[in-house]
């Protein structure tokens, strides 16, 4: 029977499927961080258990770490407790830890792939909703809750219902300057923030195949923002080229065998999806959100929506509420919207390709008066590479702040947060009310769009001179 990519990975990981019950699937990689793991480790201790497969568990510190200092003294009391607790738990249970002093420390969804921990055909879980990022490699990756984190620690398995399948095809090629972030925001704009609910989405089409691994990770990262359980892209030569030689990638004869196996990880001809969506790549312009969820998005040359144009009262009410919160007027040109904060970073857009794209717009320019802009590399390796290329100097010469790796301003959990009334051009993944700080307004954009907004002081169409 013809199978989709998701069905192939799922079927190969089902341990047992009792009649009338959710199947139990095997987990190949378990990623943990300081925020969602303490209670799970405690549960394992109380039960008198050990970790089932500590060698398949990888930990880092990212959500609550400081991006201005690697010292524990820079952390709040709560953050310090979380960081120190993770260190103690990893030592006690034999888990590999990339702490704040490790050269490879970084955002879990950045450092996992760059170390080769993420591999095609595997099942990967983490106590973080953006675990879908790893699906860019043809892995089945999704976020889990703290009780499930404990279950995986104890058994290396998870009870899961099988999801429905959705194909999202982006046909043709994008215009010059259009990025993976624009593609995925356009997708969410088309199907809505709940259009993928109940599905595992496979992204395909010429525009997806043309993306680098960094770009594919951006797309899969935001699968959760369309409501999907996970997002996947079939592995190909681009995938193998990225993974070859990385620390945890197969070596020698095992590498050849792995690549041969990965070549089979594609949806069979004739496989049937439960739902399908098609976009024409050439129609995608630079995107940015205007409201309070990722589905409230428009192209840079479009206007802030008018509630009176809504198709029903529910949509009208949603638009009205969002406009009130973000303090925008219907009919406003997005290029007339000013910003005072810029954040370039997060597990969506903090890789070397993202920083290079942003640096193009920062080079030889200055951050506009009244704007604070920070650049936060996603990992120690990204930071090292960027500095070797001189990107840090381009940013600092332009007036951007160059920071240490971490989740930073993506969420109002650490010291990098917005104040009430701030309006931020952000390369992160969520623009919910208060996401970056109580009373703050977030506009999701690509790294290039964020850097351009920083120097202009307002959103600009990067396809035109500014």
Swiss-Prot record:
The keyword Iron applies. Pathway: Amino-acid biosynthesis; L-leucine biosynthesis; L-leucine from 3-methyl-2-oxobutanoate: step 2/4. [4Fe-4S] cluster binds at residues 347, 407, 410. Its cofactor is [4Fe-4S] cluster. Transmembrane segments: none annotated. It comes from the Bacteria. Binds 1 [4Fe-4S] cluster per subunit. The keyword Amino-acid biosynthesis applies. It catalyses: (2R,3S)-3-isopropylmalate = (2S)-2-isopropylmalate. Keywords: 4Fe-4S, Amino-acid biosynthesis, Branched-chain amino acid biosynthesis, Iron, Iron-sulfur, Leucine biosynthesis, Lyase, Metal-binding. GO terms for biological process: L-leucine biosynthetic process. GO terms for molecular function: 3-isopropylmalate dehydratase activity; 4 iron, 4 sulfur cluster binding; metal ion binding. Its EC number is 4.2.1.33. CDD domains: IPMI. It holds the Pfam family Aconitase. InterPro entries: 3-IsopropMal_deHydase_lsu (IPR004430), Acnase/IPM_dHydase_lsu_aba_1/3 (IPR015931), Acoase/IPM_deHydtase_lsu_aba (IPR001030), Aconitase_4Fe-4S_BS (IPR018136), Aconitase_4Fe-4S_dom (IPR036008), IPM_dehydratase_rel_enz (IPR050067), IPMI_cat (IPR033941). Heterodimer of LeuC and LeuD. Catalyzes the isomerization between 2-isopropylmalate and 3-isopropylmalate, via the formation of 2-isopropylmaleate. NCBIfam families: leuC, PRK05478.1, PRK12466.1. Belongs to the aconitase/IPM isomerase family. LeuC type 1 subfamily. This is 3-isopropylmalate dehydratase large subunit.
């Amino acid at each position: 029977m013809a199978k989709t990519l998701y069905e192939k990975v799922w079927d190969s990981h089902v341990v047992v499927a009792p009649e009338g019950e959710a199947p139990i699937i095997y987990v190949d990689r378990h990623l943990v961080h300081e925020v969602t793991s303490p209670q799970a480790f405690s549960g394992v201790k109380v039960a008198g258990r050990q970790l089932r497969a500590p060698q398949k568990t990888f930990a880092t510190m990212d959500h609550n770490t400081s991006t201005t200092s690697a010292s524990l003294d820079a952390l709040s009391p709560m953050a310090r407790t979380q960081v120190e607790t993770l260190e103690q738990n990893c030592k006690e249970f034999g888990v590999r830890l990339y702490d704040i002093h490790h050269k490879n420390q970084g955002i879990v969804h950045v450092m996992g792939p760059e170390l080769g921990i993420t591999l095609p055909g595997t099942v990967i879980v983490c106590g973080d909703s953006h675990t879908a990022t790893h699906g860019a490699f043809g892995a089945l990756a999704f976020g889990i809750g703290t009780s499930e984190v404990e279950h995986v620690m104890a058994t290396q398995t998870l009870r899961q219902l099988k999801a429905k399948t959705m194909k999202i095809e982006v046909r043709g090629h994008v215009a010059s300057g259009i990025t993976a972030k624009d593609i995925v925001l356009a997708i969410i704009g088309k199907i809505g923030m709940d259009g993928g609910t109940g599905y595992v989405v496979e992204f395909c089409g010429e525009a997806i195949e043309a993306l680098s691994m960094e770009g594919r990770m951006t797309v899969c990262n935001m699968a959760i923002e369309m409501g999907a359980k996970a997002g996947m892209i079939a592995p190909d030569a681009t995938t193998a080229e990225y993974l070859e030689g990385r620390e945890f990638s197969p070596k020698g004869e095992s590498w050849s065998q792995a690549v041969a196996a990965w070549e089979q990880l594609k949806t069979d001809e004739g496989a049937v999806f439960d739902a399908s969506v098609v976009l024409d790549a050439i129609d995608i312009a630079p995107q940015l959100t205007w409201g309070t969820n990722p589905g409230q998005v428009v192209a840079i040359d479009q206007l802030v929506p008018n509630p009176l144009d809504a198709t029903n009262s529910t949509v009208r009410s949603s638009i009205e509420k969002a406009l009130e919160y973000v303090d925008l007027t219907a009919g406003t040109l997005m290029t007339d919207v000013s910003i005072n904060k810029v954040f370039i970073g997060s597990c969506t857009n903090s890789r070397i390709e993202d920083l290079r794209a942003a640096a193009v717009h920062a080079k030889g320019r200055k951050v506009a008066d009244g704007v604070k802009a920070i650049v936060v590399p996603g990992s120690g390796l990204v930071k090292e590479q960027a500095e070797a290329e001189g990107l840090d100097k381009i940013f600092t010469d332009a007036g951007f702040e160059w920071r240490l790796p971490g989740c930073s301003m993506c969420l109002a959990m650490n010291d990098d947060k917005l104040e009430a009334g701030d309006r931020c051009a952000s390369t992160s993944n969520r623009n919910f009310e208060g996401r970056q700080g109580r009373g703050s307004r977030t506009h999701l954009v690509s790294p290039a769009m964020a850097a351009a907004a920083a120097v202009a002081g307002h959103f600009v169409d990067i396809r035109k001179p500014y």
